[in-house]
């Protein structure tokens, strides 16, 4: 009976939304760590924000953020995202960026890992020992949408971990030679030839890649939606502050 009770307590701890377990005000903490809400910066007002981890529409299937619904970034990183929005608007005023994830507290990262421990998603979630780019406010998950908020077809959904969601096939490195538009274009066109995504989805995905690279943000090879700076993680940890809350 004792073991059964302990098991129930453990399961409840895993399934309970993080915000229900803490009194932390994530918004206040983000500001304390000098991060900025992108929609409050000039040029970022019309970027749409729908944080997937503030819903159950994610691979975890749980609301991990609860009260956190704004997209926070390090100020210089936010300016690059806004630059991408400006580039996109210049190409097509009927389109906008739609942000799915931004800065993520390390406590949420660790909670995510506990939720997926022992599942098929375990390898896709860092354990939060040192933190990834989201945990430093220098990564963005996003797509392109119409001004009405309808996402364009990218050939695979957010948090899809199949080959259809990839943008590059070889082991990813942060050097310029391996992360350029030609490499990504050839790979994405190859997904069409393999029958994994449609031609229209490839065009949409390449538009996102082109816009983001022009703003000096680069996609992570396994996730078409994830963009980051061209810096090794060691340098990120050296220069940035971990969102240790």
PLM feature spans:
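Positively charged n-region of N-terminal signal peptides that target proteins for export
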Residues: 1-4
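Bacterial N-terminal signal peptides
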Residues: 7-15
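Extracytoplasmic cell-surface/polysaccharide-interacting catalytic and binding patches
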Residues: 20-102, 112, 118-222, 230-245
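Segments that shape or occlude catalytic/ligand-binding pockets
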Residues: 105
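Aromatic-lined carbohydrate-binding/catalytic grooves of carbohydrate-active enzymes
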Residues: 109
């Amino acid at each position: 009976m004792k073991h059964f009770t302990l098991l129930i307590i453990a399961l409840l701890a895993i399934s309970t939304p993080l915000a229900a377990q803490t009194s932390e005000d994530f918004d206040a903490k983000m500001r304390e760590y000098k991060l900025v809400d992108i929609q409050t910066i000039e040029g970022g007002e019309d970027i749409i924000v729908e944080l997937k981890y503030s819903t159950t529409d994610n691979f975890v299937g749980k609301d991990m953020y609860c009260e956190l619904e704004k997209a926070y970034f390090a100020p210089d990183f936010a300016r690059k995202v806004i630059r991408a929005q400006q580039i996109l608007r210049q190409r097509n005023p009927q389109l906008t960026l739609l942000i799915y994830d931004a800065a993520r507290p390390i406590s949420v990262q660790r909670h995510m890992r506990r939720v997926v421990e022992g599942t098929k998603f375990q390898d896709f979630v860092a354990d939060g020992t040192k933190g990834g780019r989201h945990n430093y406010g220098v990564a963005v998950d996003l797509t392109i949408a119409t001004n009405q908020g309808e996402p364009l077809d990218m050939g695979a959904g957010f948090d899809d971990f199949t080959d259809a969601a990839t943008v590059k096939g070889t082991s990813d490195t942060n050097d310029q030679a391996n992360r350029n538009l030609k490499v990504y274009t050839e790979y994405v066109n190859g997904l069409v030839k393999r029958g994994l995504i449609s031609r229209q989805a490839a065009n949409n995905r390449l538009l996102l890649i082109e816009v983001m690279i022009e703003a000096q943000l680069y996609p992570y090879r396994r996730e078409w939606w994830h963009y980051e700076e061209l810096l090794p993680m060691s340098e990120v940890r050296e220069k940035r502050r971990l969102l240790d809350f």
